[in-house]
């Protein structure tokens, strides 16, 4: 018990330091810029699934719907990012307008190449705490967050729905940690720009990511 309390105290201290270090980053790298970068990574992951030959028809349909929706969202995200940082409008909406055309023309490989290039220009910058891996001592708290926020849709039971919500334990281990973090950042607020901000702190998100990637989940077996 004493060891656990010491570890939690350590995390609180680290979180405080991270808040100071991330504050300066946030000034130059705002919420909309982060959302833009995260959506670019999620789009690449969805597009790679779409290109896989063993993807089921129902998943192909749902992936197509999600990709089209996210591509349409990018231009709005660019404008919002520019408004948030009016001192340097580095995000050019013209770079994103051709993406929907490529998708509508079934030019999927050129589209993937373009998205990868854009991610190089607009990388997802994570705070140090979001890049950290937490030990199993924190997984009880993560389990509570999972049951409260995620399990209703992401238990795996909805995997064959028109818009499937995949098992997060399995998904987190089948893709890179960066892409999974991007999916958590975008998924917790939904796809609508006007929805509520992410309800979790970076520390809570990082604990959840560590939990999904490392915990043995009986329901996922």
Identify the residue ranges that each predicted region occupies.
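Electrostatic cytochrome c docking/interface patches
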Residues: 30-32, 110-145
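Positively charged n-region of N-terminal signal peptides that target proteins for export
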Residues: 1-4
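Gly/Gly-Pro-rich "capping" loops immediately C-terminal to redox-active cysteine motifs
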Residues: 155-190
